[in-house]
A protein has these predicted regions:
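Rossmann-like NAD(P)-binding element
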Residues: 58-95
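Rossmann-fold NAD(P)-binding glycine/threonine-rich loop
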Residues: 97-137
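A short helix->loop->beta-strand "cap" motif at the edges of active sites that frequently abuts
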Residues: 30-31, 88-92, 114-116
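NAD(P)+-binding Rossmann beta1-loop-alpha1 motif at the extreme N-terminus of oxidoreductases
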Residues: 1-63
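Short beta->alpha hinge that forms the Motif I/post-I loop of the SAM-binding pocket
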Residues: 38, 72, 97-99
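Internal alpha-helical scaffold of NAD(P)-dependent oxidoreductase catalytic cores
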Residues: 139-174
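Residues at the starts of beta-strands that form the adenosine-phosphate
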Residues: 7, 32, 117, 144, ...
Length: 174
């Protein structure tokens, strides 16, 4: 599969984030994978598992990413968006994997500029396990990923997220 993005940043490396990293690596979604987590222990585990090319506890590690996927608890997503926003390159698409959308959109969009569209997403997949060791590349295989981009220019950017859905698991429906 051809890489969809040059640099993919995943913020939060629990089950979903680590599965995205594994899928991106397995299916060639990105030329470079960046893993960001506030927990240094998680970052050390990510390095040991070889889930990313770059692994950091710093929000600034999103710099240069074409796509940033927020894989953090819904209650923390606004704070995380505020931390990464100053480091986003113009044109970088920001997405999430939260199970609710209205609260996430309300928490994230005030921190992003028009140059960084937000495309909310909800991959309908998961297990009862958590942490970077629990992820697996096929978590999203034959699963839905619901995209909820707002009306307007951002909707045109959702093709990048649809492509990422294919990259996480080529057999999934974008």
């Amino acid at each position: 599969m051809t890489a969809v993005v040059e640099r993919l940043a995943i913020v939060g490396l629990g089950l979903i984030g680590s599965s995205i990293a594994r899928g991106a690596r397995t299916y060639g979604l990105a030329r470079e994978i960046v893993a960001i987590d506030r927990d240094a222990g998680v970052i050390e585990r990510v390095k040991a598992l070889g889930l990313a090319d770059v692994a950091s506890t710093e929000a600034s590690a999103v710099a240069g990413a074409d796509l940033v996927i927020l894989c953090v608890p819904v209650g923390a997503i606004g704070d995380v968006a505020a931390q990464i926003a100053p480091h986003l390159k113009p044109g970088a698409v920001v997405s999430d994997v939260g199970s609710v959308k209205a609260a996430v959109v309300a928490a994230v969009t005030p921190h992003l500029s028009e140059k960084n569209p937000f495309v909310p997403a909800h991959p309908v997949a998961g297990t009862e396990y958590s942490g970077p060791d629990s992820g697996f590349a096929t978590l999203f295989s034959n699963r839905w990923c619901i995209l909820t981009p707002p009306e307007g220019p951002t909707r045109r950017r959702s093709s990048g997220c649809r492509a990422c859905g294919r990259g996480w698991a080529p057999s999934s429906r974008p």
